[in-house]
Amino acid sequence: MIRLDTYETEKYWEEGVVTAEASAFFITPDGLAVTNCHSIEDSVRATATLSTGDVYPVESVVYYDAGIDIAVIRISKTALKGHDTTEFACLDIAPSGTGDLRTGDTVYAIGNPLGLGLAVSAGVISATERQVDRYELPCVMSTADISEGSSGGALLNVYGQAVAVTTGAYVYGNSMYLAVPIDPVLSADLTGEGQSLSAVSEALRVEA
């Protein structure tokens, strides 16, 4: 699991002023990680901090879709702080994505709530396809707690496979936490070098 720190300007980057914190998780050992699209918008730089304390720079964005709020980023193996690595520990994606989820299934949300570090919460699926205005795909709704900073974390099934990406909650409800299906990542082309964070942020501003 990753704590994702983003920087809105080069000046903030140079001064070490973090603009926002979010979560992300590796899906390949060579550094591809999933997060929310909204977690990287308006940023020109970002870093990934692991539970070991090692910090790695985000190199590029290889896939993003604001409509479904998912992005795949590439993280360097060369550390800014700590130890370089040859590979990252990663999560498996459920082969069917959300296809096998059923209401009442046990799930686990892992992320970086409030920037405090790795945390895990358990809950059940309360809806497998909840329509939410801001998302182009129906969301998974569960009772697994998430907080600010958890955006971009993983929602796992009982086999430890990622089925969705935690993204938000109904403010005026209780235990109504939302995650966007990870299914689009299964079919996305993740082979390219990708674009810089600043280029993607500019494109998202134009699209808005």
Pin down the residues of each PLM region.
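A conserved glycine-rich beta-strand in the N-terminal activation segment of trypsin-fold
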Residues: 6-36, 54-58, 92, 120, ...
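Gly/Ser-enriched beta-turn/beta-hairpin loop segments
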Residues: 9-17, 63-68, 78-85, 127-141, ...
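C-terminal cap/linker of serine protease catalytic domains
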Residues: 58, 77-87, 113, 162-208
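Catalytic-histidine neighborhood of serine endopeptidases
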Residues: 18-21, 28-70, 75-78
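Flexible, gly/ser-rich surface segments that form the specificity/activation loops bordering the active-site cleft
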Residues: 83, 91-137, 147, 167-177
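Catalytic nucleophile loop of clan PA
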Residues: 25, 146-166
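Short conserved beta-strand and strand-loop elements enriched in small hydrophobics
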Residues: 2-4, 45-52, 105-112
